């Protein structure tokens, strides 16, 4: 039987519940704990029904069980406001933290762009940016690897029903963290991010718009080829990631229009924002788990998360 790395999920909301479904299909990850604060939450109930251990006492309810149950990776899908403390407590026990909040106290990870850069660094906290960042930063990077990008702007439009209370509390952090990652991972000299929460019924699929201003006249053929190649990379783990229109060239502006359909693991397929975030987090954790299984990554208890500014 293939060895699996045991995981805990913190936050049984939309993102945590969708992620749980993906982890149960993973060849190298085994979810064993779901952590919440409301014993009546739908996410904790679903986890219990799946045979996952649960606690409604927050991370403090998990800590006594971490070593006994062999938890080595934790996913935090709570809020930017509590993530730093959650990470500190679990890092102290040698648990690697995958951060799905916009806290961004660890380095950014957007798998098709910079996943392999995290190999061998013994990082104890990795930040998955935001759903909007995961959907759009690959496109900014696809342009910036061809030629310098002076400015990158992304607009993520998501259905209101797919946006839980944690994300709503973190709108400012969402925009700051995404804009910072457009620069640091996407390669734009200046980045801007906008999120639109659409209340339409029936709910609309996630749509994303990316605008890049190149410093010199765009090499249309090279940029188009780069974008098409990057789309294929994202589709390896998010099959519903589609280029709807573009790249459209207007002077030095390059525009790309995307939509992201989910797998429907928890919320229906319109919630592609959940899928692109949870699939990216699972892919990242799988890389670290493969390192652990090979003996190439030994987690060190007490290692503090590395600090990254969220400009």
Curated annotation (Swiss-Prot):
Catalytic reaction equation(s): acetaldehyde + NAD(+) + CoA = acetyl-CoA + NADH + H(+)
Pfam families: AcetDehyd-dimer, Semialdhyde_dh
Annotated active site: 131
UniProt GO BP: catabolic process
EC numbers, comma separated: 1.2.1.10
CDD domains assigned to the protein according to its UniProt record, in alphabetical order: ALDH_C (cd23933)
GO molecular function, one term: acetaldehyde dehydrogenase (acetylating) activity
Record: residues binding NAD(+): 162-170, 273
Family to which this protein belongs: Belongs to the acetaldehyde dehydrogenase family.
InterPro entries registered for this protein in UniProt: Acetaldehyde_dehydrogenase, Acetylaldehyde_DH_C, NAD(P)-bd_dom_sf, Semialdehyde_DH_NAD-bd
Keyword terms of this UniProt record: Aromatic hydrocarbons catabolism, NAD, Oxidoreductase
Protein name: Acetaldehyde dehydrogenase
Source species: Ralstonia pickettii (strain 12J)
Matches recorded under HAMAP family: Ac_ald_DH_ac
